[in-house]
């Protein structure tokens, strides 16, 4: 469905109305019956030393990608006509987040196919609902959504994914490592989109971006940001150190 929607947009078969006023309500998106959602401490650990551990790791990543699809399309539906996005930029905003959703859908498909090769599938293990809880917490503010979803949560993926790739390679799981390498490179562009649109919103609100980011993270995110940071990837995404280093533990 994500691919169909994006193709329709690019073909000029979809449009948006300038008077569009999406509801501030946010419910549970369409989901399969499984995975069963549980508190994070009850989710199977993600060690890569054995096949079961690698399946648990890939299942957790599949769940992240599944939720990231919904987050990207919710960004379009909820904020695509937001007044903090200049009118002449709204088509660009929508296209950016449709493309992100398309990428996340492809990432999910790659991971689920790899799970099938290992004799498993998405939904076979438990998962937690932290990403969608972040969507609910930021449903009323485009700046908060941009700060938390791409610039905190997705940026965290830039920090941890290279280590996952190396561990998978050491465990002899080259196919899984190759998939994560593809995802990692594309996630840099997703964080870059978040940074770009966050700066647009800051400009509309006459706010200094790093200071405003600190305020939003402290208001909408529990705890501090966790080093070590992948500053090379974050720099490539235009997420600079004055944003995240002051919030580190």
Q: What residue ranges belong to the model's regions?
A:
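Non-heme di-metal
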Residues: 1-249
């Amino acid at each position: 469905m994500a691919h169909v929607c994006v193709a329709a947009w690019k073909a000029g078969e979809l449009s948006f109305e300038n008077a569009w006023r999406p509801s501030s309500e946010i419910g549970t998106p369409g989901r399969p019956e499984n995975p069963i959602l549980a508190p994070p401490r009850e989710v199977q650990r993600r060690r890569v030393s054995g096949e079961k551990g690698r399946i648990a790791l890939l299942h957790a990543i599949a769940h992240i990608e599944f939720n990231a699809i919904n987050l990207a399309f919710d960004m379009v539906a909820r904020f695509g006509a937001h007044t903090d996005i200049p009118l002449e930029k709204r088509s660009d905003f929508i296209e950016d987040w449709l493309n992100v959703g398309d990428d996340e859908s492809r990432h999910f498909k790659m991971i689920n196919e790899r799970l099938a090769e290992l004799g498993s599938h998405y939904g076979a293990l438990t998962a937690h609902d932290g990403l969608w809880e972040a969507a609910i917490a930021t449903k009323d503010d485009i700046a908060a959504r941009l700060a938390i979803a791409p610039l905190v949560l997705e940026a965290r993926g830039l920090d941890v994914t290279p280590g996952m790739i190396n561990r998978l390679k050491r465990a002899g799981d080259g196919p899984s490592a190759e998939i994560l390498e593809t995802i990692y490179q594309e996630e840099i562009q997703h964080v870059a989109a978040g940074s770009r649109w966050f700066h647009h919103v800051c400009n509309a609100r006459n706010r200094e971006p790093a200071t405003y980011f600190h305020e939003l993270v402290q208001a909408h995110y529990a705890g501090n940001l966790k080093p070590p940071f992948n500053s090379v990837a974050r720099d490539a995404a235009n997420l600079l150190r004055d944003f995240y280093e002051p919030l580190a533990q």
